[in-house]
């Protein structure tokens, strides 16, 4: 019975030692880089906004242009 307790104790000690040893050798994760906003995404957002404004103005002005008698010369 004494040998069974010593084997169980040794197995438990080995398991705990292996877990602690694997945690000690682990590397910490590198921190994530801070989010940055580059100029191209800002420029693209402004371009989309200007295209929407141009589209809305086109739809607002077009009925006025179509109803009047419009001539180039």
UniProtKB/Swiss-Prot annotation:
Keyword DNA-binding among record annotations: no
Keywords: Cell membrane, Glycoprotein, GPI-anchor, Hydroxylation, Lipoprotein, Membrane, Proteoglycan, Pyrrolidone carboxylic acid, Signal
Signal peptide residues on this chain, from the entry's feature table: 1-26
Record PTM text: Contains 4-hydroxyproline; hydroxylated on Pro-31, Pro-33 and Pro-35.
Chain positions found as 4-hydroxyproline: 31, 33, 35
Residues with glycosylation annotation: 31, 33, 35
Annotated lipid attachment (GPI-anchor amidated serine): 37
Subcellular location: Cell membrane
Tissues where this protein is expressed: Predominantly expressed in flowers.
Residue numbers of Pyrrolidone carboxylic acid PTMs: 27
Membrane topology listed for this record: Lipid-anchor; GPI-anchor
Cleaved propeptide residues: 38-73
Assigned GO CC terms: plasma membrane; side of membrane
Biological role stated in the UniProt entry: Proteoglycan that seems to be implicated in diverse developmental roles such as differentiation, cell-cell recognition, embryogenesis and programmed cell death.
Family designation: Belongs to the AG-peptide AGP family.
Protein name: Arabinogalactan protein 16
Organism: Arabidopsis thaliana
């Amino acid at each position: 019975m004494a040998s069974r307790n010593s084997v169980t104790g040794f197995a438990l000690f080995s398991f705990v030692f292996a877990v602690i040893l694997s945690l000690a050798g682990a590397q910490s994760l590198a921190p994530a880089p801070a989010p940055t906003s580059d100029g191209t995404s800002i420029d693209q957002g402004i371009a989309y906004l200007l295209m929407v404004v141009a589209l809305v103005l086109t739809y607002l002005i077009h009925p006025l242009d179509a109803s009047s008698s419009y001539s180039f010369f």
